[in-house]
């Protein structure tokens, strides 16, 4: 459950509690509703909503600062091959494969080092965030005759190996805590455009560095949600 969904649910619960209170005040002969208890529940729900709004606002602000700091650190040339976006509370850094990897390989290209060092600095600065490295390919099958593709069966393997290369590069070269890193491959099954043109294929061949607030923080928030179901009578 996302923070936005949790906030929306709490607002619905709050409205239901308020409605119950209004009904009970109109029907003073009703003995099955404890008005003072209902007021307490409304106050608790309202306090929790305010807390969620504060957390979401802080998270959104940190994401924008993170995104802006990274964008400012990148050169004009780098920005042609690196796309930084904030979507639904998550920072997405999309890197073009022709910049990141040696041609037809999953080994990191030397010219990617400077860009990755800037991304690593941002990751190190924001220690309360987890980092998912996600590899994506176009729909062209792997060439099994290429010596660089030895033992690579398909685009699943290639995308996962490329993501793993970035993870290990960040860990080994820049000291990023490996406990914060996850490598994943999505093969050809997460395209952002059609593979019918060369330009489309090029856009789909990308690696995304996805920076998210640690999940356990949000699970703790959800666990603290007030139980209002009993009030909706």
Regions found by a protein language model. Give the residues of each.
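Sec-exported extracytoplasmic/periplasmic mature domains
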Residues: 47, 54-57, 75, 121-128, ...
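Short Gly/Ser/Thr- and Asp/Glu-enriched loop/turn motifs at secondary-structure junctions
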Residues: 86-90
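Periplasmic OmpA-like peptidoglycan-binding domain that tethers envelope proteins to the cell wall
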Residues: 100-114, 118, 126, 136-232
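Extracellular/lumenal/periplasmic "stalk" regions immediately C-terminal to a signal peptide or transmembrane helix
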Residues: 1-85
């Amino acid at each position: 459950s996302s923070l936005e969904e949790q906030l929306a649910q709490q607002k619905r619960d709050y409205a239901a509690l308020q409605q119950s209170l209004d009904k009970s005040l109109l029907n003073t002969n009703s003995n099955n509703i404890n008005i003072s208890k209902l007021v307490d529940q409304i106050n608790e729900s309202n306090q929790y909503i305010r807390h969620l709004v504060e957390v979401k606002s802080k998270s959104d602000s940190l994401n924008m600062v993170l995104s802006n700091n990274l964008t400012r650190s990148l050169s004009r040339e780098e920005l042609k091959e690196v796309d930084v976006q904030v979507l639904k509370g998550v920072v997405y850094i999309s890197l073009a494969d022709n910049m990141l990897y040696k041609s037809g390989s999953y080994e990191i290209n030397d010219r990617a080092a400077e860009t990755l060092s800037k991304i690593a600095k941002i990751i190190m600065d924001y220690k309360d965030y987890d980092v998912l490295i996600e590899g994506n390919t176009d729909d062209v099958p792997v060439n099994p005759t290429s010596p660089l593709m030895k033992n690579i069966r398909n685009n699943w393997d290639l995308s996962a190996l490329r993501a793993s290369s970035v993870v290990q590069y960040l860990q080994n070269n820049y000291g990023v805590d490996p406990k914060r890193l996850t490598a994943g491959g999505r093969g050809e099954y997460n395209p952002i455009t059609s593979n019918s043109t060369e330009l489309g294929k090029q856009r789909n061949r990308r690696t995304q560095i996805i920076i998210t607030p640690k999940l356990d923080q949000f699970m703790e928030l959800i666990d603290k949600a007030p139980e209002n179901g009993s009030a909706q009578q």
